[in-house]
Amino acid sequence: IVSTATATSSETKISNEETLVVTTNRSASNLWESPATIQVIDQQTLQNSTNASIADNLQDIPGVEITDNSLAGRKQIRIRGEASSRVLILIDGQEVTYQRAGDNYGVGLLIDESALERVEIVKGPYSVLYGSQAIGGIVNFITKKGGNKLASGVVKAVYNSATAGWEESIAVQGSIGGFDYRINGSYSDQGNRDTPDGRLPNTNYRNNSQGVWLGYNSGNHRFGLSLDRYRLATQTYYEDPDGSYEAFSVKIPKLEREKVGVFYDTDVDGDYLKKIHFDAYEQTIQRQFANEVKTTQPVPSPMIQALTVHNKTDTHDKQYTQAVTLQSHFSLPANNELVTGAQYKQDRVNQRSGGMTSSKSLTGFINKETRTRSYYESEQSTVSLFAQNDWQFADHWTWTMGVRQYWLSSKLTRGDGVSYTAGIISDTSLARESASDHEMVTSTSLRYSGFDNLELRAAFAQGYVFPTLSQLFMQTSAGGSVTYGNPDLKAEHSNNFELGARYNGNQWLIDSAVYYSEAKDYIASLICDGSIVCNGNTNSSRSSYYYYDNIDRAKTWGLEISAEYNGWVFSPYISGNLIRRQYETSTLKTTNTGEPAINGRIGLKHTLVMGQANIISDVFIRAASSAKDDSNGTETNVPGWATLNFAVNTEFGNEDQYRINLALNNLTDKRYRTAHETIPAAGFNAAIGFVWNF
């Protein structure tokens, strides 16, 4: 398997039968026999990457798109048209939940590649084994767990001209007797993004991470302890060509994830019971959010003439998560492999906010200032039972069936606020609210492997996303607007169908899937019209008020393919996604949902093997068709685009322990923006990296 500097190869093609994955079965199995569409970014691809963001390593996987919410340092991913809030993020199979998530954004990818062994991406809502949020899919970051000698490691440094930024990382791992370990750390400092129109302000960011793994093996027993931390500082890019704002800033000076996890596995090797797995973790996500908006608008009144409105908000929130999972693996008669388990998870969120709003007229007739403080406490608990059975009921035939039962409970335990206006103090206290739900979701897959080098599959799966605490109970402010939670929200649901084929023969590597999904009760933000949920507020030209509600239905049709031919000196490859998506509300039905109908990558690779060096080169085009969106009442259009790129990796040394990676991106200096990124893409840029394996 050959990887390239921009994460082309191993994640966009079928790996061989030796590639093991764990996400689809909660136990190690080869990728070839996976019951779902899954693709893997291996460690070599991660080492060869010169991307500044780990999200960019996923962008060429069919069905995956990048979104940024105007935050250059917090890129997220969408899968099969579903927003990042509907993509489940796992680290070693443990959820990274985010109760502050809205309808179009999630927690992000708060991990650094220095800790990673590989990344597994499952397309579709196969959440039976892992839980809610996976209508779009699952991204499981698998960390390194040790080595086969006393000490080995990787040192990596990358310079990127697009941001004039550096990234450095180191990871050391090894084993001593029955113990194994891994220590890793990274630091990244990226400047403002360089585009064909110059560098963009407010697109710089920094992040750093540290991690430790300690393991102990004794006979059939394996114990593990993981500690990791990731910290990010970034801010929002905005365009104001008309000078509408006197001041505008949205900053996240701190977004930090800290986690402690414990793991235990044992091989029972009984008549039926074969393995037992236990894991538990505590995770904290802290965020600081600062927002300032100042505008002046003319008013046709001689007593006012012009009105200046100035808003400032500072929010600190902290989410504390505790979770535990117990799982058993049985080998039953008649070729049945059964996984059963139970899971408990609790998220607790504390949020405190301070704000200032002032209104001043040019004449001085209006001069009003209001200061506010608020404090919220809320929590969500989930209990679930799950089971999945693989039954090989005939030669070449395997039937996988899974089920998961949820019991969820959310409640607002405290909601206090105080405001000061012209010496008058007003106190508010929200009533304690609660919401609960119980749901059973299922999945099934039928696989046939009776043809040489060919695996066929048909699958059905249900998706389920329960509203976050922010969507249910909290009042949030950003960009001069206020959004109210709604305790009457229902969970989002989806039914999904898929036909797929994998082929590995005659120098061809092909993975393809046709998929269809129907989703309902999508949660979206609506304009306030004076209703109770909005505290009687109404949206206007001077004040923006929104609230969450279930309004949308969606249908999605798609075709994914990744193919590579290795029978020539130059290996052609292609990966892409064809998608059509339809939204439907009580007042609207449209297929213009902002999705490019076609996007993907096509290229040629070449490997030159010499005495003391291997040179792997890759020239490719990355492209997407135009995208139109009129689902929000206003029409937006994103033109289609295509970029020409070149990457080369050079391995040298007695054991190929040194590696130089060079990527020349956007060679024609194309001016463009992707469909789901609000920040314009970088122009022509070069990135160079050095890797030392020891």
Please give the residue ranges for each predicted region:
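Acidic, small-polar-rich N-terminal luminal/periplasmic segments of exported/outer-membrane proteins
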Residues: 4-149, 164, 464, 499, ...
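Transmembrane beta-strands of outer-membrane beta-barrel pores
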Residues: 157-163, 176-178, 187-191, 218-220, ...
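Transmembrane beta-barrel wall of Gram-negative outer-membrane proteins
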Residues: 159-189, 199-237, 252-269, 332-333, ...
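Flexible loop and strand-edge segments within Gram-negative outer membrane beta-barrel domains
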Residues: 190, 196-197, 203-205, 222-275, ...
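Outer-membrane beta-barrel signature, preferentially recognizing the C-terminal barrel domain
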Residues: 242, 246-269, 374, 378-380, ...
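Signature of Gram-negative outer-membrane beta-barrel scaffolds
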Residues: 338-452, 575
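Gram-negative outer-membrane beta-barrel transporters
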Residues: 392-399, 407-408, 507-511, 515-519, ...
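C-terminal beta-signal and adjacent terminal beta-strands/loops
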Residues: 464, 515-521, 525, 622-630, ...
